[in-house]
Amino acid sequence: RGRGQQLTSTIDPLLFVKKAVPITEVRYESARMINDLPIDEKIKANLISKGYIKPTEIQDKTLESILSGADLMGIAQTGTGKTGAYLIPVIHKLISTNPAFQILVVVPTRELAVQVEHEFKSITKGFSMHSACFIGGTSVRKDIERLRMPAHVVIGTPGRLTDLARQGALNFSRFTTLILDEFDRLLDMGFSKDIQFIVQAMRTRKQTILFSATEEKNQRKLIDKLLHRPVEVRVSNGKVTGDHIEQEIVRVGAGESKMQILL
C-alpha cells in the first residue's frame, strides 16, 4: 500500500461484544438423609457427629458408583464435599476387606494432603484403621520408618510418593484403588509424569477415581488413559465457562491513552 494510506480493519468490532449470562445459584438438596445412605452405621454416626445432615450433590451422585468399584470422574468445585465423596465409600469398603496399603490418594499440595488425612481420621473415629501422609518438606527417613507400619489409606503429594517408591520404601503395586484429587491442579503444577509413573507401577489397580474442579480438552487424552469406561458426574456448580464474562468495546481516539480511558 502507498505511504500515508491508513490500514482499516474488515473485522466488525461488534463481534467482540458479549453480554454476560447472569449467574444463577443452583441449590441442590438430596432426597436422602445421612441415615438413608447404604454405608456402615458407624460411619453414619461419625458423619452425623460432624454435623452432616444430608450428603452434598457430589457425594449423593457418586456414592453408589464408587461403592460398585467403577472408575469415576467427578467435576465439582472446591468446597462441594469432594473429599467426603471418595473417602466415605472407600472407608465403607475397607471395613469388609481391611487390608493395609489398598487405597492411594494423590493430591497436589501439602495442605490438601493434611486436610484429607484429618477428614479420614474423623470419619474413621473408633475404627481400627490407619492412614499415612507423605508430603514434601518433612523427613524422608521418618517417612520410610512410617511405611514399616500398616496404613489402610496412603495420602501424599506426587513428588514425595515417587521419591519413596524409587528408594524402594513404597510399593505402588500393592494398591488397588487410586484416587486423584484436584486433578486439574495436579496437571497445572507439572505432575503429569509423576502421575503416569504411579499408574504404570500400580499393576493391580482395579479402580481409579478422579476429581477435578474444571474440565479441559487438553486433559482428556490423559484421562482416557487413566480411566476405563468411567462413570462421569458433573454437579450443578462444577462447570467453568466464560459465559459469565461481559465483553465491551471501548473506542480510543487518536492521541488518547488507552490506560487512562480504561481506568
PLM region descriptions:
Residues 76-80:
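The conserved Walker
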Residues 44-45, 99-166, 174-177, 221, ...:
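Conserved nucleic-acid-binding Ia/Ib motif block in the N-terminal RecA-like helicase ATPase lobe
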Residues 1-70, 108, 250-253, 262:
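N-terminal intrinsically disordered, low-complexity tails of helicases
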Residues 104, 123, 132, 143, ...:
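Interdomain coupling/hinge region of P-loop NTPase helicase/AAA+ cores
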Residues 72-74, 103:
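Conserved beta-strand position immediately N-terminal to the Walker
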